[in-house]
Amino acid sequence: EVRRFPAKGEMIFGLYNNSLSQSVYNTFFGAIQSSGTFTEGRQDLDKVYETSSFASDNTDVRFSSFYRQNGQTFTFQRLVNNESEIKNAPLQGLTLIRLPEMYYILAESLYDKDKAGALAALNAVRTSRGLKALTADDAKLLSRESFEKELMAERMREMPGEGQVFLAMKHFN
């Protein structure tokens, strides 16, 4: 299994690595147990995932798939939840590119000449994740700058823990 939400049919290209689960566990969980080291995650997840706008017809399923809330803190559970998963449900590799990334690339390339096409590409990902589609008059889409900001936010929601956000920051800045 390559754990990338929702994985089924979305991975275009990836790399096989049968020891990934153990490596992730050793790095993030083993060190915590043996040394008492604590790795603090993002404190702004409610803002990143816009949880204040969640409703029965508008809930980003990535949020509950990637994080578990424990009081005021969040546990990142996307790659490995616990030690038993290393044997029972190990990660088998890394995704290098997948369908949502292709939609983001398409949306960015279309924005200047075909805003409706750019919006459709972005909404293809958003609606597949349980969110309502954005409309053409949404403030997030009115300028190139606000559109790029929304694409960046989408990458943050879609690809936590992968290093992709750093590359996007280099690209957009």
What is the role of each PLM region?
Residues E1-G30, E40, S53-N173:
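Acidic/polar-rich alpha-helix caps and helix-coil junctions
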Residues S34-Y49:
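Short, cationic low-complexity segments
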